Amino acid sequence: MNDNREQLTQQIIDAGRFLYGRGWSPATSSNYSARLDEQRALLTVSGKHKGQLGFDDVLATDLAGNSLEPGKKPSAETLLHTQLYAWNPAIGAVLHTHSVNATVLSRLVRGDRLVLQDYELQKAFAGVTTHEGQVEVPIFDNDQDIARLASRVQPWLEAHPHCPGYLIRGHGLYTWGARMSDALRQVEAFEFLFECELKVLSLSR
């Protein structure tokens, strides 16, 4: 294992412990990745507890989502990670989480997007410099056919190059960043904002 791969793998392991500890990636849910180079990514293998990841629980894939390590099975949602690396060369890490807030809010919001507006913490997202604008978070219906789901995500990405993340209804959040620390920051910001939105909804009933 070269130094770069070892460092990125450790970042994935550390992310898993942090996200599990916050209750945002329970049990074997969720998946995480980091860009290894222009043609490859490192991803968590299928079915592993994210708070207990080890070095053997991360594998390399190509950007088509194919495992480059015989005997290791990538997550079923690998294509949703590699799609992002192919879409934007600046993305260095992708995190998919299954928090209660993301899961419930995605079911409550009517329509195909959540609009975040006038929150100071919107500035935690890459490229956002003021609370005064809107951050649109698309919500895609869950689909066990990942290639079909990816085909629905792609047009949104192309039309919204500064999109910081998206939700899958009743499922969870995808967000990303140039580095793992950036992706983790965005998860934390999303979780705060999702909780705010849920409280607003509950108080307005």
Curated annotation (Swiss-Prot):
UniProt pathway annotation: Amino-acid biosynthesis; L-methionine biosynthesis via salvage pathway; L-methionine from S-methyl-5-thio-alpha-D-ribose 1-phosphate: step 2/6
Binding site for Zn(2+): H96, H98
Keywords: Amino-acid biosynthesis, Lyase, Metal-binding, Methionine biosynthesis, Zinc
Catalytic activity of the protein: 5-(methylsulfanyl)-D-ribulose 1-phosphate = 5-methylsulfanyl-2,3-dioxopentyl phosphate + H2O
Cofactor: Zn(2+)
The keyword Protein biosynthesis belongs to this UniProt entry's keyword annotation: no
An example molecular function term from Gene Ontology annotations: zinc ion binding
Keyword Amino-acid biosynthesis: yes
One Gene Ontology biological process: monosaccharide metabolic process
Annotated Pfam families: Aldolase_II (PF00596)
Enzyme Commission designation: 4.2.1.109
A GO CC term attached to the entry: cytoplasm
Cofactor details (free text): Binds 1 zinc ion per subunit.
HAMAP family: Salvage_MtnB (MF_01677)
Function: Catalyzes the dehydration of methylthioribulose-1-phosphate (MTRu-1-P) into 2,3-diketo-5-methylthiopentyl-1-phosphate (DK-MTP-1-P).
Family, similarity comment: Belongs to the aldolase class II family. MtnB subfamily.
Designated name of the protein: Methylthioribulose-1-phosphate dehydratase
Organismal lineage: Bacteria, Pseudomonadati, Pseudomonadota, Gammaproteobacteria, Pseudomonadales
Protein encoded by which gene: mtnB
